[in-house]
Curated annotation (Swiss-Prot):
Pfam families: MutS_I, MutS_II, MutS_III, MutS_IV, MutS_V. This is DNA mismatch repair protein MutS. GO terms for molecular function: ATP binding; ATP-dependent DNA damage sensor activity; damaged DNA binding; mismatched DNA binding. NCBIfam families: mutS1 (TIGR01070), PRK05399.1 (NF003810). GO terms for cellular component: cytosol. ATP binds at residues 665-672. It comes from Sinorhizobium medicae (strain WSM419) (Ensifer medicae). The lineage of its organism: Bacteria, Pseudomonadati, Pseudomonadota, Alphaproteobacteria, Hyphomicrobiales. Keywords: ATP-binding, DNA damage, DNA repair, DNA-binding, Nucleotide-binding.
């Protein structure tokens, strides 16, 4: 996404970068504008924050874009090439707030600062401008500043590579969070590309421009919008990839890192190169790249991920999502790890059960868990502090975060020692044990209790840590007392009680007396020798002495030396911390793991969740299942308790394929909630969480699909029904016998018979071809007869009661089939006018009477399984109908008398009557 300045992207008559870089432009530019053009030409894909005094100013198209995005005034500054120069600006002191807004909108920003003193510029000549250069590239996927990051969310930069070899191209993804050092790789495929990208949720995706402009992949990048950023294809060169990665890590070979495909190496090297570019060759403390297998995580297609509202609701809010309902973590790292587990549920029962073991152990020991959570609350975000220190952007508080995090880890290790732990918690304890205690001791001995934000402010090294520093501080801090003593001495020598020693930035320290008292200072030779005149004011005179000048030098040198010693100490401690990066990150991950397990244990106790049995079977048996989000919402509202319902999609005895429930029932009866809750229970179980049920036995699901909700896609010319059919097609083409499929109201967006036919065929396909576990909710009650033909299909219904013409929704699922949808009752509850409701009842009665006389189900009941049914219009056509058509075609009304026309009409009627 080059938002900026190609001619095709101009706003009105604003000059593009290409225009600005032309010879004509450069030859007429002022020195300042020439400097701007040169820097802008090297940063075409970024908004340029150009430092001018106390403001960052933006010009030309950058100004137009930024003013619109930030809601700030667009003004102008002079002209260039006969056109006014659009300009806007933001104060330097508030720049981070504006950067945060731009980054959230997907922009990239190049921050340009003065890199020399104005005095140096003057030495080069009168027209020389102060040198400026880009000191920071801020992009959505490469930020590290706390103010620009969400503590509970990862901030991934992702690279997509494609290698053409053989008949099918190979795809791979690499994703890096430079704020925490995470670096992972995975192969993918075109068919699952969007699903894998959305699973990771990168803030920025770089990819070759050739891939970005591939029309076959256009739908993927349309969904991603500004997240997808094309880069030159050479950045993804697989031939040089291994060498680039090796150089970054300072190793001769990647053999010790594991085995990677060409596509994975291409993606990884592109990501690393982009990080180096944006960090201006500074290297964050990235971990060794870890390879993920696609088969190790539950595949959730994009529509399902959105419809189930895992991390965000359909409106984009975190409130109301499953993640919000599950999150009981007390650390930033724990919150990020919980989100990662939710977005990438496992398919390996052994790994899942290790997580469940930890939750069970902590749930069984509530006092221990409470103590651990209290200790965790004192743990700052060590990985992000470490990253800032490694990039040279850290401050004293980042060192303090490492110190406090290590202290919390030591406290938790003491709690864990001697306890009987799960495998996962034992590994976490061992990782914490690997922390360098000597480093913590040095941090404790060095850092003050109260730490400033910026290292240039000083005061972060504790008293007693450095003898010279203590001496210089004493001189600096006692200067006021020394100056006061000197002032008293001069008052006594001169007899001038109003004499004062003052200080300003021009004269430094000076003696000030009134004009009337000045004679006492300079009327004698001794006075003139001792008191040196500095300045005459209207009502006062100012002097200095050799003694005062020497004291001033000592005080100034002491302050400078204090800051120099503190900065030296900071650099030493930073190097020591970064040298232990791997141990610190391992301990931080251990703390996050404990936090997630403890949080889920608290959740299980609080919400009465149970441990699911997870194995490699094809079972799916839920007793007393509840919707985790809806249940908590009802409790907050003090409403009626959630009605629990069971669900058993396990293969019937002797069968290998999963069972399908065909769910019928009224509108507002709870069908959609029931469908979603079972999908969410499967996700929670496989992420390694207890589940909202009285009992649950789940054979791992490899793919989860849902078709619930209805929306159109106008941007791509798709109606609601077309979107529904595309999603249904993906399910029928991709679901396996280990998949879980939930379908809601397939076929409702078209004519009744068309929709019924599609729903019928889809159910058959799921049963006979996919052989998956599934829930299929429908208002096509005719489908319930399929239970007589399909051995693994059962009918279930949402129960209701009728009372005095009203319907009471029980929200209970039971065996059987509904024969009514109670749509008119729901319409009345929604507030439709009484006249409309009454008319609807009359029409419904007539339609139901007609259906009883000639039920459409008679035709459907006779449909053979998986054979092409004769079209309804062909089945309804009598053998003589075509002859009648031929006779009708042969008639020429213009050549017929009225009598002949009447005879012909009777003849046609007779043919039709004899069908």
């Amino acid at each position: 996404m080059n938002f900026l300045m190609d001619a095709s992207n101009r706003t009105g008559d604003v000059l593009s970068v290409s225009d600005l870089a032309s010879e004509e432009s450069r030859s007429t530019a002022t020195p300042m504008m020439e400097q701007f053009i040169e820097i802008k030409a090297n940063n075409r894909d970024s908004l340029l924050f150009y430092r001018m005094g106390d403001f960052y100013e933006l010009f030309f198209q950058d100004a137009v874009e930024a003013s619109r995005a930030l809601g700030i005034t667009l003004t102008k500054r002079g002209q260039h090439m006969g056109q006014e120069i659009p300009m806007c600006g933001v104060p330097v002191h508030a720049a981070d707030d504006y950067l945060q807004k731009l980054i959230a909108l997907g922009y990239r920003v190049a921050v340009c600062e003065q890199v020399e003193d104005p005095a140096e510029a003057k030495k080069r000549g009168g027209k020389s401008v102060v040198r400026r250069d880009v000191v920071r590239l801020v992009t959505p996927g490469t930020i590290t500043e706390d103010k620009l990051l969400s503590p509970s969310e990862s901030n991934y930069l992702m690279a997509l590579a494609r290698i053409r070899s053989g008949s099918e191209p190979a795809y791979a993804l690499a994703w890096i969070d430079i704020s925490t050092g995470i670096f992972r790789l995975a192969e993918t495929a075109e068919s699952r590309l969007l699903a894998d990208i959305l699973r990771i949720e990168p803030r920025e995706l770089i990819l070759p421009d050739t891939v970005f402009h591939d029309p076959d992949l256009r739908p993927v990048f349309d969904v991603l919008g500004r997240v997808a950023v094309p880069q030159p294809a050479i950045l993804f060169d697989s031939a040089t990839a291994e060498g680039r990665i090796s150089r970054y890590y300072g190793v001769g070979t990647l053999d010790g890192f594991g085995s990677f495909s060409r596509a994975e190496l291409a993606a990884a090297s592109a990501a690393v190169s982009y990080v180096e570019k944006t960090q201006l060759q500074e290297r964050p403390a990235l971990g060794i790249p870890e390879r993920e297998s696609a088969a190790s995580t539950l595949f959730i297609d994009p529509a399902t991920r959105a419809n189930l509202e895992l991390a965000k609701t359909l409106s984009g809010s975190r409130d109301g999502s499953l993640l919000k309902s599950l999150d009981r973590t007390v650390t930033s790292g724990g919150a990020r790890l919980l989100a990662e587990r939710l977005m990438s549920p496992l398919t390996d029962p052994e790994r899942i059960n290790r997580r469940l073991d930890s939750i069970e152990m902590l749930a069984d020991q509530p006092r221990f868990t409470a103590d651990a959570r209290d200790a965790l609350r004192r743990a700052p975000d060590m990985p992000r502090a470490l990253s800032r220190l490694a990039l040279g952007r850290g401050g004293p508080r980042d060192l303090g975060a490492i110190q406090a995090g290590m202290r919390a880890a030591v406290a938790i290790a003491a709690l864990l020692s001697g306890a009987e732990l799960s495998v996962e918690l034992a590994e976490a304890r061992d990782a914490i044990a690997g922390l360098p205690r000597d480093l913590l001791a040095r941090l404790d001995a060095t850092l003050a209790e109260e730490l400033p934000l910026l290292k240039r402010d000083g005061g972060f090294v504790r008293e007693g840590a450095n003898a010279e520093l203590d001496e210089m501080r004493a001189l600096r801090d006692q200067s006021r007392r020394v100056v006061a003593g000197l002032q008293l001495q001069y008052c006594e020598e001169t007899g001038i009680k109003s004499l004062k020693i003052k200080h300003n930035n021009v004269l430094g320290y000076f003696i000030e007396v009134t004009a009337g008292n000045a004679g006492a200072m300079i009327d004698t030779d001794a006075g003139r020798a001792r008191f040196i005149h500095r300045q005459t004011m209207a009502n006062a005179m100012r002097f200095t002495t050799t003694e005062l000048a020497e004291l001033e030098t000592k005080i100034a040198n002491a302050a400078d030396r204090v800051l120099a010693i503190e900065l030296e100490t900071f650099e030493v401690m930073t190097r020591e911390v970064v040298a232990e990066a791997e141990a610190i990150k391992a301990a931080a991950l251990a703390l996050a793991t404990i936090d997630v397990s403890a949080g889920l244990a608290v959740l299980a106790e609080e919400q009465n969740y149970t441990r699911p049995a997870v194995d490699r079977s094809r079972m799916f048996a839920i007793d007393g299942g509840r919707h985790p989000v809806v249940e908590q919402a009802l409790r907050r509202q003090a409403a009626n308790p959630f009605v629990a319902n069971g669900c058993d999609l396990s293969p019937p005895g002797g069968e290998e394929g999963g069972a399908i429930w065909l769910l019928t029932g009224p509108n507002m009866g709870g069908k959609s909630t029931f469908l979603r809750q079972n999908a969410l229970i499967a996700i929670m179980a496989q992420m390694g969480s207890f589940v909202p049920a009285s009992a649950a036995h789940i054979g791992v699901v490899d793919r989860l699909f849902s078709r619930v909700g209805a929306s159109d896609d106008l941007a791509r010319g798709r109606s609601t029904f077309m979107v529904e059919m595309v999603e249904t097609a993906a399910i029928l083409n991709q679901a396996t016998d280990r998949s879980l499929v939930i379908l809601d109201e397939i076929g409702r967006g078209t004519a009744t018979f068309d929709g019924l036919s599609i729903a019928w065929a889809a159910v058959e396909h799921l049963h006979e071809v996919n052989r998956c576990r599934g829930l299929f909710a429908t208002h096509f009650h005719e489908l319930t007869v399929l239970s007589e033909k399909l051995g693994r299909l059962s009918n279930a219904t949402m129960r209701v009661k009728e009372w005095d013409g009203d319907v009471i929704f029980l929200h209970e699922v039971g065996p059987g089939a509904a024969d009514r949808s109670y749509g008119i009752q729901v319409a009345r509850l929604a507030g439709l006018p009484a006249s409309v409701v009454a008319r609807a009842r009359d029409v419904l009665a007539k339609l139901e009477d007609a259906d009883r006389k000639n039920p459409a189900s008679q035709l459907i009941d006779d449909l053979p399984l998986f054979q092409v049914a004769v079209r309804r219009e062909e089945a309804a056509r009598a053998p003589g109908l075509s002859r009648a058509e031929e006779a009708l075609k042969a008639l020429n009304p213009d050549d017929m008398t009225p009598r002949e026309a009447l005879d012909a009409l009777y003849a046609l009627k007779k043919q039709l009557s004899n069908r």
